[in-house]
Amino acid sequence: MIKHVVCHRSRDKAEAYKIAPMLNALMGKVPSLRSMETGIDFMDSVRAYHMVLIATFDDRAGLDEYATHPEHMKVKEYIHSVLESSVSVDFEC
């Protein structure tokens, strides 16, 4: 199993409330996506990111499919239009 974890900071935290449902809606649209969990930060510390996504895939090929899937690319394009910074980690478990 592969976990794909991404933390986003937008120029405006309100964007996280738009992005989370867009990411969650990818379930059922991207065949290799096994689960999608999103969360919005409530601590508002200066070092916090606004939101996190945790997605799971059966294998690296599934993650690769997700990365280039047209539905994911639409969401990614929007995220990049409002993004200040992000970090990600992909790991096998």
Language-model segments: which ranges?
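NUDIX/MutT-family hydrolases
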Residues: 72
